[in-house]
Amino acid sequence: MAFDAMLQRQIMGRFATGVTVITTRFGDEVSGMTANAVISLSLDPPLVAVCVDRGASMHAYLSQGGCFAINILRLDDEDISKRFAKPGPKDFSDLRVEEGQTGAPILSDALAWLDCRLVQTVETGDHDLFLGEPLAGATGEGAPLLYYGGRYDRLVSGTVREDRA
């Protein structure tokens, strides 16, 4: 008997994650998508990964662009997260954006960011893992935007609020 995918989704929804916007450039085109399936794979050598649905337009951009930036969102960036979670073209026009070393857009007001060169793509079911080598990065001050139980959340005194359970 196969494991129930909806049960897996419910279980993983109990795992609080940070919220990021993954950005990339392919030629003159830039794109971005909200992602919480982002991991630090290795410190030696430095490697990170983002998991992207094969049906998402971002999949093609990442595959062809060869680079990406992980922009970790601040607590007050819920609107940015929602913007990049929607399908279709992405509007960067009102955001402060810098071009990273790889050419990927960096959200200047992000809590932290990594600019990565794509080094490998691993097929994993209906999603692929894009492995990146960080070439540059920075951190800022503030609280992160979290995602828990299908909702945006925040840290309270070092713990996730329990009134959302």
Role assignments for model-derived ranges:
Residues 1-165:
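Basic, polyanion-binding surface patches
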